[in-house]
Amino acid sequence: MKKIIASLLLLISSASVYATDDPVSFVKKLPYKQVVKDIVLSRCLAQVADDKSQFSLDAARSSNALLEWVPFDIENGNDKINALINKYKGATNAFHSERKPEVQGVTLNCLRLYYSDELNKLAPQLIIGNPDRTWIQDNPQ
């Protein structure tokens, strides 16, 4: 009997560990407007990387996965995001001291976009509802 009880307790404690191990819990805690900014950064990195690279594919899929946790205006949002990315991704960064012709500084362009006033203004507009809320606030358990 003691073995059965011990086994049940072990099973229950193991199940609770896996139940609380949510790999996207960090995303669910972020304000929607922050997740949109992260979507834009991921998408920008996907677009500036070699389109056949594993990194580009991973960044694109990460961007798409983040959309699962945001009430995103899909009809207007994608075009607005892509237009803003296109504005930033082609900038030339000639000021870098180690710049070689094949080095364009595209990661820097994506970071510049991420911290831009334009993205700070756009991100809340792409949310259906309150951009300061989080997924957890809107989906209590």
Which residues does each predicted region cover?
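Compact alpha-helical subdomains of small soluble proteins
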Residues: A59-Q141
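N-terminal signal peptide c-region/cleavage motif recognized by signal peptidases
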Residues: S13-S16
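N-terminal secretory signal peptides
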Residues: T20-L66
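Residue-level signal for mature regions of secreted extracellular proteins and peptides
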Residues: S7, V35-K37, V103
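Sec-dependent signal peptide recognition
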Residues: K2-L8
